[in-house]
From Swiss-Prot:
PANTHER family: PRE-MRNA-SPLICING FACTOR SLU7, STEP II SPLICING FACTOR SLU7
GO process annotations (BP): mRNA splicing, via spliceosome; RNA splicing
A GO molecular-function descriptor: enzyme binding
Mapped zinc finger ranges (CCHC-type): 113-130
Residue ranges of the region described as Disordered: 1-44, 193-212, 465-620
Ranges of compositional bias, category Basic and acidic residues: 21-41, 465-479, 513-533, 588-606
UniProt keyword list: Metal-binding, mRNA processing, mRNA splicing, Nucleus, Spliceosome, Zinc, Zinc-finger
Record's protein name: Pre-mRNA-splicing factor SLU7
Record carries keyword Metal-binding: yes
Record's compositionally biased regions (Basic residues): 534-555
Function, as annotated: Participates in the second catalytic step of pre-mRNA splicing, when the free hydroxyl group of exon I attacks the 3'-splice site to generate spliced mRNA and the excised lariat intron.
GO cellular component, one term: cytoplasm
């Protein structure tokens, strides 16, 4: 601000008859500008506040330093920028506080405006805390209470409201000091009395001179020194570092010594590692690395790992940004984990038992003597004594379905389980007894037996046809036997000729040739047997077609007849029962394959069969639908049946 210009209202300008058209000349404006620059540079003196007498900063802009027209002033001033005294809130001084323990004087006569009940000034009858009197003080003028003391209305600031020492009188601490001094004097008197009676020996130094108990009294007020006043002999406790103490970074002055971090004042590695003759120092200080694994470090690391696992599982939790949330989640997780573990353990114990073994008996019972005698051999088996009771299964026992005499799983061969009584590998299949075992063993050895030796001939096949088939088989066997005999005669002739030519023993090539010849014969028999089986099946299909055609014709012919008990009706009923039995056999076979695929854990029930014995139709249907393991097409037929019923 270069110069002061009085800012007057229009009314004052009119009274003073100031001409508004008068303006400063160019030279005056230039002079004021130069003066302003000099004041800012410090070469010219600054303007002085007419009210406070202090210099006005020349760098203050004019719109701030110039007082408005409604604030009159005699010269340059900054009073308009400072807070107004009449608007300032007067705060309570530090020595002002509520008076405590005040008692007013009681009057002898009732005064106007006092409480009608107790007679004290300061409150009315409806606000009186005294017990309502039967005869109040206004009527009796007796036993008038003391007047109420009106506490001052203190205006406290932010810090004054939160000052814990507000209203404290330091002079009250003198009473505490005096109490301690009286206790100390009483202690000295009691100690002198005990020393005179000989109950306590006087304290002495190492040289035998009497020890001065007040030798550290002057140092008791020093920082870091505390005197134990309660013990019989005073002990000075110094928590400051002594001068002979060596800093961490001075233990090892080698160039490759462990690094000392001055910011955290830590040396993680051991400075005496590999230094001979420093075993005692290494025992006192071996580095600060142990701090990294002490305290809450392990818990913090576990929380961090839990946060990673929770985030991977879809629950976002940050160990640094949300520590409270992470701790709550971890507590809830540990609680649910322990609850689930206990529930699972309880379910297993309820299902299988053995809860009495989970609790450890007392040591007196474990180490006590018993009367039960048990003797073991070198292999750990019980020779004498009570053996362990076999654990009973939760499955039903002694139930053999489908005419079996053993359970499924009692026989094992080539990676498959089966029945021991008949060597069958299909579960819920009908038992074939010893014939099934013979067929299975012959198939395993390479020799085969016909189906007629294993299964009985169905009733639908006529006896004459069976006889014809047997005669054909016998004729084929005779032909094969003749061929074999011819081959044997030829071989004998060759052997005789070879013997006559060379009496040397047969070579390995001849033995291999004999084995190949046997294999060719076995293969030939197998092919012939397969051909006979195919011919039988073809004939069987033709007979079925012929019977179906006859049955249809009989149905057409019997529509006009009224007799329901004819022979065709009985045959149709038997055929219907046969079809139902065939469907049932196929359904049971499909269910058995499904159960075998699902396994013991997958299926719902362990027993899904009926205990009733099968009738003749069901047995016949089982024989018709069953595929023997010796059949070369057995694998193909089983796979085809499985594909058909798994769609």
């Amino acid at each position: 601000m270069a110069s002061y210009k009085q800012n007057l209202p229009p009314s004052a300008l009119i009274k003073q008859q100031v001409n508004v058209a008068d303006k400063k000349s160019k030279a005056e404006v230039q002079r004021d500008r130069q003066l302003e620059e000099d004041r800012k540079a410090g070469t010219a003196p600054a303007m002085v506040d007419v009210q406070t007498g202090r210099d006005i900063n020349p760098h203050i802009p004019m719109f701030i330093s110039q007082n408005p027209w409604y604030v009159p002033s005699e010269g340059p001033t900054l009073k308009h920028q400072r807070p107004h005294e009449e608007r300032e809130k007067k705060m309570t001084q530090i020595h002002e506080w509520y008076q405590k323990g005040t008692t007013g004087k009681s009057a002898t006569k009732f005064r106007k405006g006092a409480c009608e009940n107790c007679g004290a000034m300061g409150h009315q009858k409806r606000d009186c805390f005294d017990r309502p009197r039967k005869s109040n003080a206004k009527e009796t003028n007796d036993n008038i209470a003391e007047d109420d003391y009106v506490q001052p209305n203190l205006t406290l600031g932010f810090d004054a409201k939160r000052d814990r020492w507000n209203g404290y009188d330091p002079s009250t601490h003198k009473q505490v000091i005096e109490d301690y001094e009286h206790l100390e004097e009483a202690r000295k008197v009691v100690r002198e009395h005990e020393m005179k009676e000989g109950e306590v020996e006087p304290a002495t130094t190492e040289d035998g001179a009497p020890k001065d108990e007040d030798m550290y009294a002057e140092d008791a007020d020093m920082a870091g020194v505390s005197v134990d006043m309660d013990s019989r002999t005073r002990i000075t406790v110094r928590n400051l570092r002594i001068r002979e103490d060596t800093a961490k970074y001075l233990y090892n002055l080698a160039e490759n010594s462990p690094y000392y971090d001055p910011k955290s004042r830590s040396m993680r590695e051991n400075p005496f590692a590999g230094v001979a003759g420093k075993e005692l120092e290494a025992a006192r200080f071996s580095g600060d690395n142990f701090v990294r694994y002490s305290g809450e470090v392990t818990a913090a690391n576990e929380a961090q790992v839990f946060a990673w696992q929770a985030t991977r599982g879809g629950v976002y939790a940050h160990s640094i940004a949300e520590p409270t949330k992470l701790e709550a989640l971890k507590k809830e997780y540990e609680k649910e984990k322990s609850t689930l573990k206990n529930e699972t353990q309880k379910e297993l114990l309820d299902k299988y038992g053995g809860g009495e073994h989970m609790e450890r008996p007392a040591d007196e019972l474990l180490l006590a003597q018993t009367e039960s005698y048990i003797e073991y051999n070198r292999k750990g088996k019980v020779i004498k004594g009570k053996e362990k009771v076999a654990i009973s299964s939760r499955f039903k026992e002694d139930i053999y379905p489908q005419n079996h005499t053993s359970v499924f799983g009692s026989f094992w061969r080539e990676g498959r389980w089966g029945y021991k009584c008949c060597h069958q590998f299909v579960k819920n299949s009908y038992c074939t007894g010893k014939q099934g075992i013979e067929a299975e063993t012959s198939a395993a050895k390479g020799t085969t037996t016909s189906n007629e030796e294993i299964f009985k001939v169905p009733k639908l096949v006529e006896k004459t046809e069976v006889k014809e088939e047997k005669e054909k088989e016998d004729s084929i066997k005779d032909e094969v036997a003749e061929e074999n005999s011819d081959n044997d005669n030829d071989e004998e002739k060759e052997k005789v000729s070879e013997k006559s030519i060379s009496p040397s023993p047969p070579s390995d090539d001849e033995e291999k040739e004999k084995e190949r010849e046997k294999e060719r014969l076995i293969e030939k028999e197998r092919r012939e047997r397969d051909q006979r089986r195919r011919d039988k099946k073809r004939e069987k299909r033709e007979r079925k077609k012929a019977k179906l055609g006859k049955r249809k014709r009989r149905h057409r012919d019997s529509d006009d007849e009224s007799d329901p008990s004819s022979g065709s009706g009985s045959e149709s009923d038997s055929d219907e029962e046969m079809r139902k039995a065939m469907k049932k056999a196929k359904r049971e076979k499909a269910e058995g394959m499904k159960a075998a695929r699902e396994g013991d854990r997958g299926r719902k029930y362990n027993t899904d069969y009926s205990n009733t014995a099968p009738n003749e139709k069901e047995m016949e249907a089982y024989r018709v639908t069953s595929v023997h393991s010796a059949d070369p097409m057995a694998a193909y037929m089983n796979s085809k049946f499985e594909k058909k019923h798994t769609k």
